[in-house]
Amino acid sequence: MKKGGLICFTGLDGSGKTTQAEKLLNTLKKKNIDAIYSWSRREPYLIKPIVTLVKKILKESSKSEGKDYLNIKKKRKRRLFKYPLFQKMWISIAIVDYLAKLFFQIYVPFYKGKVVICDRYIPDMIADFAANFDYNNYQIRKLLKNPLLRMFPKPDKYFYIKVPANLGYKRKLDDTSFEYLSEREKIYNFLAKEMNMVVINGTQDIDNVFEKIKVEMRI
């Protein structure tokens, strides 16, 4: 079966990755390249009922994480995530669930020869795990070697749109907390090196950022 292409954008909320992914999609379509856009944030799919139950146990509301991120994280660690066995089990289940979610979004079009422009992908999932479980760099490296990750199509390009947490916070119009972004900023910076991403300064204006992407894509 013919394989297509996979271009992934990753970075903090508020980095502008969605804007750049959409600009790339439009540019490729103008060149008559069969491309599609996939918003691929890891969210509960088959395991949604389990996640809902866990949140009820922890007495969390759907909007509470952004407003009270640090307290919720401490509560999770005290109750469930403090057990290493539970962490490993949960990560494996979540990865398989993510694979199922992406089957029609990425797998099918990719193996039909389309170019899939992915807004969020494996690094964003890893960043969530690392933040939730307070993983250090050594633990993140081990997580990147999880055999289940080999089942994901390998991207042709990883674009990390890099912005500081304070800028991402200013750009966001929802309840995302600064602490949430600050914690993940360090993780993304580490992942960018470990996964050989193309790092682009997202503090520039939109057109300048896209020019850098076009150079990397040779379009």
List each model region and its residues.
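Short beta-strand-centered segment that lines the nucleotide-binding/catalytic pocket of NTP-utilizing
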Residues: K31-I47
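NTP-dependent small-molecule kinase module
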Residues: N166-I219
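Hydrophobic anchor at the beta1->P-loop junction of P-loop NTPases
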Residues: F9
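P-loop (Walker A) phosphate-binding loop of NTP-binding proteins
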Residues: L12
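A glycine- and Lys/Arg-enriched "phosphate-lid" helix/loop adjacent to the NTP-binding pocket
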Residues: V115, R120-N189
